[in-house]
């Protein structure tokens, strides 16, 4: 699924920050997985990776609705 260009609720331009967040998310997931890509290890249902603080750490000024769109959109081709 693609990240929307603007937030459906408030109209914030999410698309301008999508590439920055995607790169940071990939690196964050790789560090949480021990330096390997998720496609190279078996799926573990108990693994929890919190992404809510990643947007704050990047300094992206977003509301909760925008964070929901950005965090829940995942391009499965990169990980599976």
Curated annotation (Swiss-Prot):
Zn(2+) binds at residues 7, 10, 65-66. The keyword Transcription applies. It comes from the Viruses. Keywords: DNA-directed RNA polymerase, Host cytoplasm, Metal-binding, Transcription, Viral transcription, Zinc. One of its GO terms (biological process) is viral transcription. GO terms for molecular function: DNA binding; DNA-directed RNA polymerase activity; zinc ion binding. Component of the DNA-directed RNA polymerase (RNAP) that catalyzes the transcription in the cytoplasm of viral DNA into RNA using the four ribonucleoside triphosphates as substrates. Part of the viral DNA-directed RNA polymerase that consists of 8 polII-like subunits (RPB1, RPB2, RPB3, RPB5, RPB6, RPB7, RPB9, RPB10), a capping enzyme and a termination factor. Belongs to the archaeal RpoN/eukaryotic RPB10 RNA polymerase subunit family. This is DNA-directed RNA polymerase RPB10 homolog. It comes from African swine fever virus (isolate Tick/South Africa/Pretoriuskop Pr4/1996) (ASFV). The lineage of its organism: Viruses, Varidnaviria, Bamfordvirae, Nucleocytoviricota, Pokkesviricetes.
